[in-house]
């Protein structure tokens, strides 16, 4: 079922990807019963005291899929999913794939500002949230978003306290009452392999996130090929420590790549060393994915003697931001296993260093494309290719890089060339080994511990505050997170503005906490370039030593 606003691959490219065997012409959900039949009573998912075998997981996914349809949802619908790492997330994702419902992968850190936009833009018919996480009432927010979104008819809540106006997700996720009938029903309504399997979120520079449409064809290949490159098999035990709705832990190879190969998925609610390192030891974790800030904490915890190194670790993937060489050099000696740098994006292209690469390649580069038909160009400002070794903007296209964002024609005209090349916004150079080295971004993004924040979005929010005349949001270096948000503001005469008041105002707007400024600099005027634009390069130099600061949250 094709949605209006979805940009398909051109027929010539699609035919080529099918002929090459990248696209197998099967929806992702059609593989589940093969997994159950092959791996049966092998443990598939571990979430605290909950352990589900492959057979149990698939029975629950089928049961949930049928009950979602019985609740009024239809194949082709979209569901806003904001669940923490847990068995409910895995089961619901698989159920959606079986029923032809496309999950919109929101983050647990998102608040009403983001959720209302995502729900409206994707025209979701259902929302799935936890009851509470920490001190935040997600159920209450989910109820508000549902009431504000006319298309929503079902609010699902995972947790021990479910309101009378919501539906208990855990109860719906019981095994199918009649497994044979449920399987036959879902097989009959299976989506087309070219349909949207999942909506991922961009780290866009132009305000709120863009929706990335990943089809069953391309996302199945994304996970399958990633698992091949990373060497996952039925003995693999993969730890999900990053938010599971991110592309990285979901399908690079992540949850899907592990389940395809009969491995075990272990879910952690937090990447904090005190929780994760003992869990890795107890479950015999062999592979995991992390961002540089998390890896640094793990290294410090092991090197200081607070925790032993994970004894079974074979593969440590690091991505989401560039890994400093000095940290990369310590990863293998301290944590064990093989370091794999990952440079990828929810929009498609995945670059991996290979496990058998020499140490200098694993430390100094961010990998090479995983597919022979991944096309890359490194170009100058006029889109002319630059010589190998010189820096330029990265363009790409391939069998798992979509040709456009969802319902974003105007943005697509800027983000994609007429012949389908995606402008990634990354500045790279080609290493003599053929790998890519990431030098930075040509887009206005702030990378806070792997979460990409649009400077423009933060600026537009601060502009709503009384007395703000001009504002620029820039990245400030952070020793743990890599970068954090610094707001540089010009105020109208007589206006008093503090960091605390800005954060309080944005919190009241229901903005995700990780987007809140952590530094504020009030200035008389903003520096401008020769063409009258705010000179952010100069501002980044200024904020290095002149901002009032709060502790990173």
Swiss-Prot record:
Its EC number is 6.2.1.65. It holds the Pfam family AMP-binding_C. Disulfide bonds: none annotated. Substrate binds at residues 246-247, 533. GO terms for biological process: catabolic process; fatty acid metabolic process. GO terms for molecular function: acyltransferase activity, transferring groups other than amino-acyl groups; ATP binding; medium-chain fatty acid-CoA ligase activity; nucleotidyltransferase activity. ATP binds at residues 203, 320, 342, 426, 441, 533. Keywords: Aromatic hydrocarbons catabolism, ATP-binding, Ligase, Nucleotide-binding. Disruption phenotype: Cells lacking this gene are unable to degrade salicylate. Induction: By salicylate. PANTHER family: ACYL-COA SYNTHETASE, MEDIUM-CHAIN ACYL-COA LIGASE ACSF2, MITOCHONDRIAL. Belongs to the ATP-dependent AMP-binding enzyme family. This is Salicylyl-CoA synthase / salicylate adenylyltransferase. It comes from Streptomyces sp. The gene is sdgA.
């Amino acid at each position: 079922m094709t949605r209006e606003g979805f940009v398909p691959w051109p027929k010539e490219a699609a035919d080529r990807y099918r002929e090459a065997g990248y696209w197998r012409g099967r929806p992702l959900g059609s593989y589940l019963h093969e997994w159950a039949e092959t791996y049966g009573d092998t443990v598939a998912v571990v979430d605290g005291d909950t352990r589900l075998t492959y057979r149990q997981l698939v029975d629950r996914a089928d049961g949930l899929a049928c009950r979602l349809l019985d609740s009024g949802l239809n194949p082709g619908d979209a569901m806003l999913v904001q669940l923490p790492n847990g068995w409910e997330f895995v089961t619901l994702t698989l159920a959606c794939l079986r029923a032809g419902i496309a999950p919109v992968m929101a983050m647990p850190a998102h608040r009403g500002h983001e959720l209302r936009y995502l729900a409206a833009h994707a025209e979701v018919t259902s929302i799935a949230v936890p009851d509470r996480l920490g001190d935040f009432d997600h159920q209450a927010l989910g109820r508000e978003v549902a009431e504000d979104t006319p298309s929503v008819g079902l609010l699902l809540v995972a947790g021990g306290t479910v309101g009378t106006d919501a539906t208990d997700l855990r109860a719906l996720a019981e095994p199918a009452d009649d497994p044979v009938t449920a399987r036959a029903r879902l097989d009959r309504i299976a989506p087309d392999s070219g349909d949207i399997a999942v909506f991922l979120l961009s780290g866009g520079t132009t305000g709120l996130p863009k929706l990335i449409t990943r089809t069953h064809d391309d996302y199945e290949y994304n996970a399958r090929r990633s698992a091949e490159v990373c060497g996952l098999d039925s003995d693999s035990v993969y730890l999900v420590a990053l938010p599971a709705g991110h592309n990285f832990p979901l399908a690079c190879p992540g949850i899907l790549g592990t389940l395809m190969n009969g491995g075990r998925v272990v879910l952690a609610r937090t990447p904090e060393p005190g929780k994760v390192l003992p869990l890795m030891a107890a479950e015999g974790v062999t592979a995991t994915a992390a961002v540089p800030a998390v890896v640094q904490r793990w290294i410090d915890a092991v090197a200081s003697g607070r925790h032993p190194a994970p004894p079974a670790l074979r593969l440590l993937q690091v991505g989401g931001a560039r890994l400093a060489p000095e940290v990369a050099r310590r990863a293998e000696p301290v944590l064990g296993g093989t370091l794999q740098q990952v440079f990828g994006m929810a929009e498609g292209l995945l670059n991996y260093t290979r496990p058998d690469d020499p140490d200098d390649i694993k430390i100094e580069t961010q990998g090479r494309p995983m597919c022979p038909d991944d096309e890359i160009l490194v170009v100058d400002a006029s889109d002319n290719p630059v010589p190998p070794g010189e820096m330029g903007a990265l363009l790409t296209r391939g069998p798992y890089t979509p040709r456009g964002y969802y319902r974003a024609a105007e943005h697509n005209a800027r983000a994609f060339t007429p012949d389908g090349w995606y402008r990634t916004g990354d500045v790279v150079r080609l290493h003599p080994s053929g790998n890519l080295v990431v030098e930075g971004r040509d887009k206005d993004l702030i990378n806070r511990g792997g979460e990409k924040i649009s400077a423009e979005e933060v600026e537009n929010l601060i502009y709503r505050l009384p007395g703000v005349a001009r504002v620029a949001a820039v990245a400030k270096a952070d020793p743990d997170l890599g970068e954090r948000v610094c707001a540089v503001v010009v105020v109208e005469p007589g206006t008093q503005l503090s960091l605390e008041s800005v954060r309080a105002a944005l919190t009241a707007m229901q903005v995700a906490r990780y987007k809140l400024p952590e530094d504020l600099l009030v200035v008389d005027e903003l520096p401008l370039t020769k063409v009258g634009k705010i000179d952010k390069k100069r501002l980044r130099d200024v904020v290095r030593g002149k901002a009032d600061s709060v502790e990173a949250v």
